[in-house]
From Swiss-Prot:
GO biological process: cytoplasmic translation
Family under the similarity heading: Belongs to the universal ribosomal protein uL6 family.
Role according to the record: Component of the large ribosomal subunit. The ribosome is a large ribonucleoprotein complex responsible for the synthesis of proteins in the cell.
Subunit structure: Component of the large ribosomal subunit.
Matching SUPFAM superfamilies: Ribosomal protein L6
Keyword Disulfide bond belongs to the record: no
Gene symbol of the encoding locus: rpl9
Cross-referenced Pfam families: Ribosomal_L6
Keywords attached to this entry: Cytoplasm, Ribonucleoprotein, Ribosomal protein
Keyword Signal: no
Listed name of the protein: Large ribosomal subunit protein uL6
GO MF annotation, one: rRNA binding
Cell compartments where the protein resides: Cytoplasm
Organism of provenance: Ictalurus punctatus (Channel catfish)
C-alpha cells in the first residue's frame, strides 16, 4: 500500500544556519561548514518559518522502503548540526598481550603509523579522512583521540585504524591484540 504523504521535521538551533540548494543541504555552525547532497533520493526538502528554523522532509506516494529514507535524511541532518556545534570525538585504545604497539602520529595528525604490532617489523600507515584530526592522549597511556565535525569521516577513520590491526592466520579468540574504539562522544560537552 502506498502512503500519500510522509513528513518529518528537523529543528535548527539558533547558532546554526541551514541553506538548501535543490537537494544539497549546507549546515554552518560555530565549528565550521558541512555540505551533503541528497540528489539520489526523490524527496522534497523545505525550510519552514519566518526565520527558517525548521527543515521539513516530504515524501509523496512512497512504498515502505522509500518512506524509511525520510527519517534517514533527518538523522543525517541532525548529525551535521551536532557536528558543527559540538563536534565528534572517538577514543581508541591499544590492546596487547606481549608486544607493545607503538603508535606515532605524522603530518600534524593526518597520518597514523603503527609499529611493533605482534612484534612485526612492518610499519602500518593509516591516513585519516579529510577534516579528521588524530592525536595521542596526554592523560591516558596507549590512547588515540580522533576529532572532527563529520561523524561519518571520524568513524570511518577509526574503522581504518582498527582494520589495519587485524590478526591474520591466528585464532582471534586468543590473539586479541589491536587498536579498538573505547569511547564515542562530542568534543564540546553539551549543556543539559
Amino acid at each position: 500500500m502506498k502512503t500519500i504523504l510522509s513528513t518529518q521535521t528537523v529543528d535548527i538551533p539558533d547558532n546554526v544556519d541551514v541553506t538548501l540548494k535543490g537537494r544539497t543541504v549546507s549546515v554552518k555552525g560555530p565549528r565550521g561548514v558541512l555540505r551533503r547532497e541528497f540528489n539520489h533520493i526523490n524527496l522534497e526538502l523545505r525550510l519552514l518559518g519566518k526565520k527558517q528554523k525548521k527543515l521539513r522532509v516530504d515524501k509523496w506516494w512512497g512504498n515502505r522502503k522509500e518512506l524509511a529514507t525520510v527519517r534517514t535524511i533527518c538523522s543525517h541532518v541532525q548529525n551535521m548540526i551536532k557536528g558543527v556545534t559540538l563536534g565528534f570525538r572517538y577514543k581508541m585504545r591499544s590492546v596487547y598481550a606481549h608486544f607493545p604497539i607503538n603508535v606515532v602520529i605524522q603530518e600534524t595528525g593526518s597520518l597514523v603509523e603503527i609499529r611493533n604490532f605482534l612484534g612485526e617489523k612492518y610499519i602500518r600507515r593509516v591516513r585519516m579522512r579529510p577534516g579528521v584530526n588524530c592525536a595521542l592522549s596526554a592523560a591516558q597511556k596507549d590512547e588515540l583521540v580522533l576529532e572532527g565535525n563529520d561523524i561519518e569521516l571520524v568513524s570511518n577513520s577509526a574503522a581504518l585504524i582498527q582494520q589495519a590491526t587485524t590478526v591474520k592466520n591466528k585464532d582471534i579468540r586468543k590473539f586479541l591484540d589491536g587498536i579498538y574504539v573505547s569511547e564515542k562522544g562530542t568534543v564540546v560537552e553539551p549543556e543539559s
